[in-house]
């Protein structure tokens, strides 16, 4: 049985104290609002001083903590202190700091429940080559993918790539399509960018529609799931800024088989390409929360899936958004609209999407985060300028995980 958004769920779990990490992310703000709606007390731990959840009316308190990436030990100590001080019942890592939280999960679980898988499993799923090999071993559809760790390996594989169509190049550790090199428009990375410590993959380019999924999984069983189409992005291949729920049995069955075979627990997302015949190929895995959260409304039952997955499994219920539900990040969506202006058809499509989707950041009852976006972007811009990195990279530079301590 699937619970649609029209069938509002009764919240049965006792109000709890929940600590979310990644207060800079819209998904964290959206989940915080859902939790607050059902009486839970929400706390935030964030390493950026300026973030979306700061000042939100649904958040009890925020803590500024050290960088997970650059000060891991201090970060975990600060997180444990937050858990004890606020008497947290459930800790949910929301962004890439999940890899660091996983390293300290054993200690943190002495004080509260922590929604995180093992560091080893997270690494296997995050690694863009290891994930493909794992899925391939299960007989699941994935594109041909080659691991390149040095200039010699790049040279050896060139003859295969030249004869075999178009290829996408991307770092093994990357996010939001950062540094991705698409065929035709961009050349392969130079040998100075590739090393054993910074490997890349060459992945066969598949023409088709981009689809993404978000799921909550308990011991290999789906308890919540959304599939959504990526129509508008920050760039040609950047992060999605518009999300529309679609029904897609192929993607659903792919995810269901994969999470069952790896016995996953937690939040997880996948990126797919759907060919014209409807077949889907998984190209990446994100073993953490993703933007699919935005498609769930407070009454849909996502909070219950996070708190009481066992009860949903016992009742044989699975939470999904209503087909056709739409959401967007309004400010970057405006930027995407400017890019559509050179085509009347594209602009018309964008305008239709704009008018039919809700902004996930702005609500009348909690306006502060909408205006906080300006401060967040300005802070990231200063970091980008100082470190000579892109704005997207600046937004994750202190929390991203690139295989360290493996």
Model-derived segments and their meaning:
Residues 1-116:
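ATP-binding N-terminal substructure of ATP-dependent carboxylate-amine bond-forming enzymes
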Residues 121-145, 150, 155-162:
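Glycine-/Pro-rich loop/turn segments that contact NAD(P) or position catalytic residues
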Residues 135, 143-145, 159-179, 197-208, ...:
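ATP-grasp fold ATP-binding core
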Residues 177, 232-235, 240, 286-299:
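Glycine-rich phosphate/pyrophosphate-binding beta-alpha loops
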Residues 184-253, 273-281:
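Phosphate-binding site of ATP-dependent enzymes
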